[in-house]
Amino acid sequence: MEKYEKLEKVGEGTYGKVYKALEKSTGQVVALKKTRLEMDEEGVPPTALREVSLLQMLSQSLYVVRLLSVEHVDCAKNGKPLLYLVFEYLDTDLKKFIDSHRKGPNPRPLPPQQIQSFLFQLCKGVSHCHAHGVLHRDLKPQNLLLDKDKGVLKIADLGLARAFTVPLKSYTHEIVTLSYRAPEVLLGSSHYSTAVDMSSVGCIFAEMVRRQALFPGDSEFQQLLHIFRLLGTPSDEQWPGVSSLRDWHVYPQWEPQNSAPAVPSLGPDGLDLLTKTLKYDPADRISAKAALDHPYFDTLDKSQF
């Protein structure tokens, strides 16, 4: 790792520690992700190789953080080599951007054109992942990095991504920050699809408009109460099979509310798109690809993307 000079630790990702670093030969600032995936006697474990090849494939999109290289390092501590992933570096994320508009010296709404542009780029990135058979499963504002000068948004931290080309694989539950978690995951469904990411996209969209989480639960139960209070408690007619999901019968039966007051500055097209991302039945939820053609984006200059 002599090639890089670590400047500061900038976080803990799904992979492990993340550092801001300088590539000495070029002067380029990069993000170094030290993976927890230690190599075994055979070399790099197949899971790590799969993850890396997936990241390389996905980072061909402008809207996914680019993986620049992979470095093998001999670790003196236990003699096991480590794997560092070298990514392009972006200095802020959507959470910090929203927070800067909510608090601080100059609280103000995000400009509608900015929301439109960020959402379009997010849908482009998600559509790219889905087209390559990958669910992100942990989309949240902290995982959406921004190049503020260029107005570009990029999806990061695909550490929980799994190829979903194996149909209806039983996935593990422990994923996704609660506020962006899809109802089928919260209700314990172990079979899910690309629709889980679109539910997160809807929550992120609403948060850009509101500057605070749409469903700010601190437990799975609380999270579902927030969702059901606004969208109504789903029925088997709306969402076939929902009543057979875990803990279903403990929830009060609420009627759906008008969502408009929750996102007061959003026009009819925006509200329609939001509603389509938050549909209960995953099969009815709008796809990322279809979202790109939604009338909400008609006033956006798409030639720039």
From Swiss-Prot:
Which positions carry Phosphothreonine?
A: 14, 172
Coiled-coil annotated spans:
none
Indicate the transmembrane segments per the record: none
Q: Where do the Protein kinase domain residues begin and end?
A: 4-297
UniProt-listed Enzyme Commission number(s): 2.7.11.22, 2.7.11.23
Q: State the Gene Ontology terms under molecular function.
A: ATP binding; cyclin binding; cyclin-dependent protein serine/threonine kinase activity; protein serine kinase activity; RNA polymerase II CTD heptapeptide repeat kinase activity
Per the record, its GO cellular-component terms are: cyclin-dependent protein kinase holoenzyme complex; cytoplasm; nucleus
Keywords of the record, alphabetical order, are: ATP-binding, Cell cycle, Cell division, Kinase, Mitosis, Nucleotide-binding, Phosphoprotein, Serine/threonine-protein kinase, Transferase
Q: What class of enzyme is it?
A: transferase
Q: List the disulfide bonds.
A: none
Amino acids binding ATP: 10-18, 33
Q: Name one Pfam family in it.
A: Pkinase
PTM sites of type Phosphotyrosine: 15
**Might you name a Gene Ontology BP term for this protein?**
signal transduction
Active-site residues annotated for this sequence: 138 (proton acceptor)
PANTHER family (UniProt xref): CELL DIVISION PROTEIN KINASE, CYCLIN-DEPENDENT KINASE 2
- State the family named in the UniProt similarity comment for this chain: Belongs to the protein kinase superfamily. CMGC Ser/Thr protein kinase family. CDC2/CDKX subfamily.
Which protein, by its recorded name, is this? Cell division control protein 2 homolog C
Q: Could you tell me which species this protein originates from?
A: Antirrhinum majus
The record's gene field reads CDC2C
